[in-house]
């Protein structure tokens, strides 16, 4: 979303903040990987990055976050998790930023944008996982897609649908963003 005090330096600082959050939030659930899989902690800062800074920044931060986190901390594992997450989160950031810049900044449109970004990201994740499985000689059945993209992540999906619009609304009221 475009802000009145938008500047290249401010955008870089905010992008770095969202990237740092994508590194740190998974550490909250790091001791129990199943909880991390359920809550999807890296998704929150990337979706917010797209909403706040726009599609190009959301795409870049979303793509970089899981790959850099894998290299620096060893989690998520690079193949196939971090690679597929890079494409998924890039789609989250790009779609949320691109759509939000083209709609009225109302609560219903925030939800519509968020839902579209979440669906697009999950579809991209499934497509990349399918391709990576084929390249490695394994399979990625539709049941695995449903389990990974939907059933396991229900708590994270609900949390995103509740928290992201609240955060965006709070940032608007504080005039941090338009």
Which sequence ranges carry the predicted segments?
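Alpha-helical transmembrane segments of multi-pass membrane proteins
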Residues: 43, 47, 86-93, 157, ...
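Interfacial aromatic-anchored transmembrane helix boundaries in multi-pass membrane proteins
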Residues: 24-40, 64-99, 133-135
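Hydrophobic alpha-helical transmembrane segments
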Residues: 12-17, 44, 48, 59-63, ...
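Membrane-embedded alpha-helical hairpins and interfacial helices in multi-pass inner-membrane proteins
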Residues: 31-36, 74-83, 103-178
